[in-house]
A protein has these predicted regions:
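Conserved small/polar residues in nucleotide/adenosyl-binding loops
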Residues: 1-5, 226-227
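N-terminal glycine-/serine-/threonine-rich phosphate-binding loop
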Residues: 4-44
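Short gly/ser/thr-rich secondary-structure transition/capping motifs
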Residues: 8-13, 122-124, 170-173
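Short glycine-rich anion-binding loops that position phosphate/pyrophosphate groups of nucleotides
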Residues: 32-34, 57, 144-146
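Gly/Ser-rich helix-loop-strand patches that form or flank binding pockets
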Residues: 37, 41-59
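ATP/nucleoside-binding phosphotransfer catalytic cores, i.e., glycine-rich phosphate-binding loops
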Residues: 110, 126-129, 178-228
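Gly/Ser/Thr-rich active-site loops/lids in small-molecule metabolic enzymes
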Residues: 132-136, 140-176
């Protein structure tokens, strides 16, 4: 474990490149939002996360404060169960150039801005046209994220070990709303047809950027995250 005084009280926390080589465990103190931020911070590095729930919502952070020391002792002794969870990689492509790159544990969402009406989102899976959704947005979620925003929008619950990605429309203007589950080897492409900056990309509900018309959001499975 490495604790540096200069990060105590820092609003920016610990940068990914500052996590020392050889780190064997990252203890996350907080709620699910803290865990999501930590997952993105160490994405691509095979360092298990040890999440302890100090927040209000602890769906992913199942270890309570009372369980901290007994569970931590098990983890240090190598007796703790480690669960692999697949993450998502998303890119924003504008005029043929990548202008944004993100990692997500839960989901990548293309949605409307506050004052926008429904937006049109052309959707492709492995270069094959699926549909143009006229909706408030589109959620691309991992199995972990299937119990988050996607569930609220009527998406299915996927077991964390399932090798799949879920595509869930948000309030689509249609008589039937059916989420689509595709293999995690698929490449999903969403083309925003919303004029101006009426569409917005959100990653794990925490970070994102505005999209302009004809921006392409390309999503695929990326690295594994390991949690206790």
């Amino acid at each position: 474990m490495c604790i540096r005084d200069r990060y105590i009280g820092s609003p920016n926390g610990l940068a990914r490149e500052d996590v020392p080589e050889g780190t064997q465990l990252v203890i996350v103190l907080g709620g699910d939002g803290t865990l999501l931020a930590a997952a993105r911070a160490i994405a691509g590095r095979e360092i298990p996360l040890f999440p302890v729930n100090l927040g209000g919502l602890g769906f992913l952070t199942a270890i309570t404060l009372e369980q901290l020391y007994p569970e931590l002792e098990c983890a240090i002794c190598g007796e703790h169960r480690v669960v692999p969870r697949r993450m998502l990689h998303g890119e924003v492509v504008r005029n043929g150039k990548t202008v944004g790159s993100y990692e997500a544990l839960n989901d990548i969402v293309v949605g409307k801005t506050q004052i926008a009406r429904m937006i049109d989102l052309e959707t492709y899976v492995d270069s094959q046209f699926v549909s143009t959704f006229k909706a408030d947005g589109l959620i691309i979620s991992t199995p972990t994220g299937s119990t988050a925003y996607s569930l609220s929008a009527g998406g299915p619950i996927l077991f964390p070990a399932v090798a799949a990605i879920c595509i869930t429309p948000v309030c689509p203007h249609t008589l039937t709303n059916r989420p689509v589950v595709v293999p995690d080897t698929s490449v999903i492409e969403i083309i925003s047809k919303a004029p101006g900056k009426e569409a917005y990309l959100t990653v794990d509900g925490q970070v994102g950027e505005p999209l302009i018309e004809d921006d392409r959001v390309v999503c695929r499975s990326s690295c594994l995250l390991y949690t206790s």
